[in-house]
Structure formats: structure tokens, C-alpha cells
Amino acid sequence: MKICVLQPDYSTTKVDYQYYDPPRQLAHLWPDAQIDNVFLNKLTTYRQLKELGKKGYDIFVNLCEGYLEWEVPGVDVYYSMELLNLPYTGPGTKLYDVPKELMKYVAYCQGVKIPAYIVIESMDDVKKAAQKLNFPVFVKPEKAGDSLGVDRHSLVYNEEQLASKVSGIIEEYGPLLAEEYIAGREFTVLVAGNAENEKTCTVFRPVEYLFPEGYEFKTYSLKTSELHPDCNVPCRDKYLDRELRKAAEKIFLGFGGAGYARMDFRVNDKNEIHFLEVNFTCSVFYTDGYEGSADFVLKFDPIGQSGFLKHIVAEGIARHQRKMKPFVIKGNAISGFGIYANRDLRAGEFIFSGEEKAQRLVTLRHVEKNWSEDDKETFRRYAYPISKEVFLIWDNDPTEWAPQNHSCDPNSAYNGLNVVTLRPIAKGEELTLDYATFLDKNMQPFHCLCGAPNCRGLIMGMPNNSVTEREARLKKVRVPRQR
């Protein structure tokens, strides 16, 4: 295994976080692997990654967690790796910096309790927050993590204190989130996606933070300059252990979670669990007194830092492999374009995974009423009938197009919304479909020149040939014919 560990070069910034983020050494966690450390400069991130992409690394372990406001590599690392199609650990651009209001919404939809809250975008919102929320109220930035902007004055007991706290940080950190304070115990839970099944995750042993004297909540200093390692203890309450894991799993999967994440929860005097927030770019792999919450989870969980590293590497590689297309587009303006296998394919392998994927839908009525004649002709050639009146059409993003040609002797076919191979296919062979098997009477007929021994000549769609009709036939359920 050849691994490149990406860490931030702080030479471009004066942000104080650099003093609490020492270089992390991972080689001892996986002695059999080749582990190289590279420090990314904010000014040259893309160029550095482009060169690193030529060195044959199996995976990039990304430990760059800079905020958008910092002169430190952050989401741009994921953006560059996605452009360069490199395998990586962590969430990618989609979940890099999730707003707290979205966190609350996802948790709520997953059936996990959340504190009542108000988003404060200006001083005008202070009075509304004071009227709708029960004091005491906790005030924090709506986006930043690591308790940035949080100090001893973040817990307020009346409107005057709320206004004072908001006015002090809204210019730098706004918008803000004001939420009803949940007095009680605080727990952190670490979650990681699984390599073998993207719909599952592993939840590690929760850790409770026992606040040092004089503190009721975590501030920026408690997470950076004033660490208290003895305050982190494993959860020994079997009920809370089980329920915290269940809540964390629901939220992670609710986000379509990828990589790993750390979540904070509060438990009140009624033993009710309330979700606070999630960090998909949580710090990890620290030693020598710099350990963060995730490291304490790994200290108390049997997997340890070594096992966790291997877990997230396997998940990152598997995730990258799943998104790799098994074909390339070839062609020119003279002979046209087609798609060709870029590796040997087994029978039954996916060429496209349309199931559970966001795709463009349109009604026939909408097309007939609003589309130009040229667009209607394209529709008749390529629209995929979901039902008699609803069709799936091509993506707005041309990089997602796949000009798969017709053959009367095809080597792939639709299975529901997926396209799968019908037989083993050699690398370099064109991937074809029989258009008549998945298009209906709206299809534009054409003369076939595929050259197959069984070539039918004129190709036409079949009546009542929609996904709905075919799925019903598979279930042996008779659907009344629409007239």
C-alpha cells in the first residue's frame, strides 16, 4: 500500500490554529505501508496534487482542514483531488463545511432530538430570538467548527447578554446560531463509512467529556490551547452507549455520509439525547498531548488509531472505485461517438447505476407544450420512458453523457434503471444496447447499420414499453392498459 498523507503548510498565514496543529506522523500506524508526508501550500495546492497524482499512490489521506476564511489549504484540496480524479479519505467538497442549520434539519428528519434554535443574520434578529427561545441560550457561528467564536460569554441568560454576544462576533463569524442550552452531560461520537457497503457505517465507542472546574461547555481554547486529556472518559452507560450510536448512525447515513465524522451530543437530566453538531473534517491522529476528541474515541475503542487508518483508507479506495466509469467515450465528427470498455468486464457488471441516482424527469405534456421542434426530435431519439407520460432525459452536465449506440446483438441491457453487461466484454470493445428493448412508440424509428447477423433493419420502439410496464411484468402483476 502506497499512501500520501496531506497536511497544511502554514507559511501563508498567521492564523493561531497553526500552533495547535503539529505535523502528524502516521508511518508507525501501518509499518507495512509506504507512507509519505506532503505539506500543501495554499498557493500551489492544485499544482502539487497534479504532480503527486503521477506517483502511483493508492490513496491520499487528507488532513487539511482549513476554513474558507483562512489562508490555509481546506476545501480546495478536495476540489482539486476531485478535478484530478484522485482517491482520498474524508468527505469531499459536498460535506466539507456543512451549515449548522442543515445539520439540525437532517438530525430532525432522522428522528433525533435537537435544541430549539434561531439563525441570527443581523442585530435585528436578536429580539426575535429572545422572544422565541427559552433562556439560557447558547450562541455560536452558524458555520465554523472547532468552537471558533465560542468563549465563556457564549452562554447568555437574557436579551441584553444575547445582544452583547451577537454584536461582538457577528461581523467576523455571522450568520450565527442561537439555540436553547441543554444543561447536562456532553458526549462525542466518531463514525466512519464502510468500504464494503456505502449504505452502512461503523460507530465507535462514545466518549464523555467531563468539564474542568469553571466550564459548562467547550470553548475554542478548550479545543486548542487548554486541552484536558483526563476529562475524556469512555461511556460506560450501556443505554446511552447504544442510543448515542444509533443517533450518530442515523445522522451520518442521513447525510449520505462518506469518509468519517465526529458528532457532539448533550444528555439532559431526563436522559434525553440532543444532537448539537457534526464535523465531517474532524481532526485525528494526534499524539503527545495534542489529542482531540476523535483520538480519545480511538483510544478507548478496540480499533485504535492504526485500525481506524486502515478502515478509512479502505473506504476511500472503495468509494473511488465505485465512481469510476467502466468505459471511455471515443469517436469523431465523421463516424460519430460511442462508449468502449476501459477494462475487461464480467457478465452482469454495471455500466450505469441509475437506481437511487438523481436524474432529470419530464412529462410528455410538458415537452409537447414547451419544447422546440428540434428539442422534440432529440426527445424522440433519446428519452427513456418511465411510464406512458413520464420520461427520463439526458443530464444537464455533458460530462455525464454517454453516447451508447444501438446494436441488434447488444452486449448490455437495461435492468430497471441500471445498465448491465449481458456477457463478458473485453477491454476496448464497444458497449451497445438494443434501443427497441427500452424505448416506446414515441421513439424516432431509424435504419440500423450494426452489421449483426440478426440485424432487423428498421428499429422501432414498442408500445407500452416503459419501466413501469416492465417492472410490473417482472412481478407478474397485470397493469390495466392506459388509453
Residue ranges and their predicted role:
Residues 111, 198, 237-324:
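ATP-dependent carboxylate activation and anion-phosphoryl transfer catalytic cores
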Residues 324-411:
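Catalytic cores of histone-lysine modification enzymes
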Residues 1-7, 52-54, 97-177, 184, ...:
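Active-site nucleotide/adenylate-binding loops and adjacent lid/helix of ATP-dependent enzymes
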Residues 1-87, 93, 97-98, 121-129, ...:
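ATP-binding N-terminal substructure of ATP-dependent carboxylate-amine bond-forming enzymes
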Residues 155, 338, 344, 423-426:
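Residue-level "contact hotspot" at macromolecular interaction interfaces
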Residues 158-239, 243-246, 267-274:
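Phosphate-binding site of ATP-dependent enzymes
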Residues 406-483:
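C-terminal SET catalytic tail plus cysteine-rich post-SET Zn-binding segment of SAM-dependent SET-domain
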